[in-house]
Regions:
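Short edge beta-strands and adjacent turn/loop segments
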Residues: 32-66
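A short coil-to-beta-strand element that immediately follows conserved catalytic motifs
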Residues: 37-40, 96-100
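Short, highly charged C-terminal tails/helix-capping segments
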Residues: 98-114
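Short, non-transmembrane amphipathic alpha-helical segments
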Residues: 73-92, 96
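Envelope-exposed proteins and targeting segments
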Residues: 57-61, 71, 97
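Mobile acidic interaction elements
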Residues: 27, 54, 66-74, 91, ...
Length: 114
């Protein structure tokens, strides 16, 4: 069952399902130049997202990605971190703490390795 977090605001209560944060991240990562978009339903072999919900609406993120050959890995990882942080914090009440990026594969010549 999905984890839910509640927030009380003056005009009512906002409830976040944990899958919302995952969806935001799934949309944020492929926007980064150099990242192979493998985020499809049921495809968790190369790209994954792990979330740890902490106190006070903080979240720790752990992602694995595949990048295209020719891109600077450090720059791509930094851009992924910024994209995740900016999107999650802009679209939810969560504050992103740590974001660990694991580059698990590099794709050469535009073709994917199996």
């Amino acid at each position: 069952m999905a984890e839910k977090n509640n927030s009380v605001i003056p005009s009512g209560k906002v409830v976040y399902n944990s899958s919302i944060v995952r969806s935001i991240i799934e949309l944020a990562i492929p926007k980064v130049e150099g990242v192979v978009n493998n985020f499809q339903p049921g495809n968790s072999s190369k790209n994954y997202i792990k979330l740890e919900f902490l106190e006070n609406f903080n979240v720790a993120v752990d992602v694995a990605v595949t990048i295209y050959y020719g891109y600077n890995i450090t720059d791509v990882a930094y851009n992924i971190q910024q994209s995740i942080k900016n999107n999650v914090e802009a679209m939810s009440e969560y504050k992103v703490g740590t974001i660990d990026v694991h580059v698990v594969d590099v794709i050469f010549d535009g073709s994917e390795h199996e």
